Amino acid sequence: MRNLNLILFTALAAVTYANVQPHDISQNGAVKDGNHLRIDLNETSSVELMDKWLSQAFSGLMAAVASKKIAKMPAEHQNIVQQCSKDAKDVREHAKCLVKLLDAEKSGKLGRKQYQKVVKSPETIVLPENPKMLTKKDLEKAENAGAAENNENLEWIGSFGTARAKRSYKVVHRDSYALRSTDDVDGMTKLAKSLTNTVRAMKNKTERAEPWVEAVGRIKKLGEEAKREKKNREVMKKRLKQMIDNTPAEFVDPRKPVALKQAEMEDENNEIAKLMRKKEADEIRVPLKFLRKAVKTALMLGGQNVTDFDQKTLKMVSPRMMSIVPEQEDESLFNLLSPSLFSLHDEGEGIEKLTSLPHLLKKLDNHGQNAWMDFIVEAAGVSDEVTKTEKVFREKKEKELRGTDGVPLYFTKENATKILGNEEKSKIEVFEDLDKSYSEEQKKKLNDDGFAFLTEKQMERLYGKESPYKHTKALKKFKRLRDDPEKYIEKDIRALAEAEKFRVARRADIVSSPFILTPLTFASAPLSNTFIVLSPLVLSPITLSPAVLGPIILSPWVFVPLILSPRVLSPLIVNPLVFSPIILSPLVLHPLILVPGVFNPIILSPLVLSPLILSPQVFTPLILSPFALNPLILTPMVGSPLILSPFVLSPIILSPQALFAVVLSPYALSPLVESKLIAAEVVLSPSWLS
């Protein structure tokens, strides 16, 4: 396959692959180890996991590219590309879907939607350097471009606009100045401070008093954070859906659909709760409906517009007292005798601003105003409620990131250092520095497109001499790709689509890695083109895992059934088998050499060119398993009948058979050569040339 240069994803995956150190395992699954969970993987599982991660990384990048370009397509074409991506079975097929998208874009089929007219106003008017080249049209553009800027400095008198001149500052000269001291504070200010201290003493508060401005600022910050979180939640749901729709089912991170479903269920539960609250409110609002109708009738008689009045919220004789944020203009709200009075801010309009406490306290100096505002905020318990709300908000966020026992569901620098050592700490610090170095443009690209490109300085930090991920060759290559990197991504996607197959690298052989209680299901990849040496299998069934070129040497099997797992060119050599039946698993070119066995029935599993050599067997019957070119050589057998298993060209050579039977198994060209039969029967099994 062509050398791929996908920026960042390939490099990170390669670095991670290089640093994996798989361990031998005694059991498989999550194990509680102190304050963390440990999942032990053998070498095969580690390689398979890395293969999966790399495939997900490539598919993730391609899904991000598709999400960016697919927005320009009509809805029906979007569905075609998304369905193609969902049906893809591997990275190569996914890349082919992307190539169709890229080709359509190049051919101009992904232009603006039909009948959509885009009008773009230039931000800057560029005029020719030579004044003689100016045309009347150019001058009109220049005049119109500056009109908006000039209008900002106009003061209108009737229908005439006059430019406002900048006011000059008047300089005052004095012979001396008097500095204020604490004794100069007026009585009202002292009273406010005294009242504030009294309230704080009653609440047993000893910490620094929080100014009212800070309390109001915290409230605004909480409100903005709640809005931002709601917006981020919607963006996250949209992004997850796009990534899932544009990623093959094979490579979808299983956590993403779960997260999307969970988010949707939470939203549904919130909506249900709102509807229930609304229903309860409706039950007690029956008398209020008469009031609403009366108000509506009065307004109609007064000649006022009552359009959509029934859909509006009626606020009647319900003044807001000491509000902490300004009243928002809301067209869905009908306000009747419900002003905002004595607000703690000086914003808003009309009565709200005139009656606000900062406005009423303007007769006092700044110290007096702030002192009385501090008292009012403290007496009302605003700071305490803000602190409680912040605590609830913080605990909710922390709860989402921790397990039921309070253990974080993620690696922190502290626990990673404790578990994995200082080397892993240095790796985490590299990514901490990298995260802090992102520019606003990079953050925007990450949010909008799902990927961004590193600067040379960032690449130096990640792959340079001082980094634990030091990779000089990769660094040089990535620096060369800084010119139009998206072109290289497109080039590599096309290379993936044309490749015959996609693999990380040649699979390493599995050596000295026991499999205990480790079911191998759909494990064709790690069992093919791999030597398995000195790796016993115990209680580890192999199911739906065909294997090609996967010899197993010096690796005994104990209670390892082979089910629906054909094997080709995968001999077993010096490999004892105990209670390991072979069921619905044809063996082709699969010799068994020095493979003694006990209780290993072969059922519905044809054998071709799979001789048993020096492999004594006890209670290993062949049932409904025809075989050809499958001699038994120096392989004595006890209690191993052939039942409904025709065979041809399969002589039995120097292989005594005891308690042996051939039942309903015709055979041809399969003579007995120096092989004594003891207590043997042949029933309904004709033979030819044997």
UniProtKB/Swiss-Prot annotation:
Keywords in alphabetical order, please.
Coiled coil, Developmental protein, Glycoprotein, Membrane, Secreted, Signal, Transmembrane, Transmembrane helix
Q: How does it sit in the membrane?
A: Multi-pass membrane protein
- The residues forming a coiled coil are 219-285
State its location(s). Membrane; Secreted
Give, from the UniProt record, the effect of changing G348R.
Answer: In mg439; defective molting
Superkingdom of origin: Eukaryota
**Which residue spans traverse the membrane?**
514-534, 544-564, 579-599, 618-638, 643-663
Q: Name one GO cellular component term.
A: extracellular space
- Tissue specificity of this protein: Expressed in the major body hypodermal syncytium (Hyp7), the dorsal and ventral ridges of the hypodermis, hypodermal cells in the head and tail, and the pharyngeal myoepithelium, but not the lateral seam cells.
What residues are glycosylation sites in this protein? N42, N204, N305, N415
What is known to happen upon mutating W688R?
A: In mg434; defective molting
Signal peptide range: 1-18
Keyword Membrane among UniProt keywords: yes
* GO-annotated biological processes: cuticle development involved in collagen and cuticulin-based cuticle molting cycle; epidermis development
Pfam families from the entry? Moulting_cycle
| Family indicated by similarity | Belongs to the mlt-10-like family.
Entry's PANTHER family? MLT-TEN (MLT-10) RELATED, PTHR21523
Role summary: Required for the efficient removal of larval cuticles during the molting cycle as well as the synthesis of new cuticles.
- What protein name does the entry list? Molting protein mlt-10
Gene from which the chain derives: mlt-10
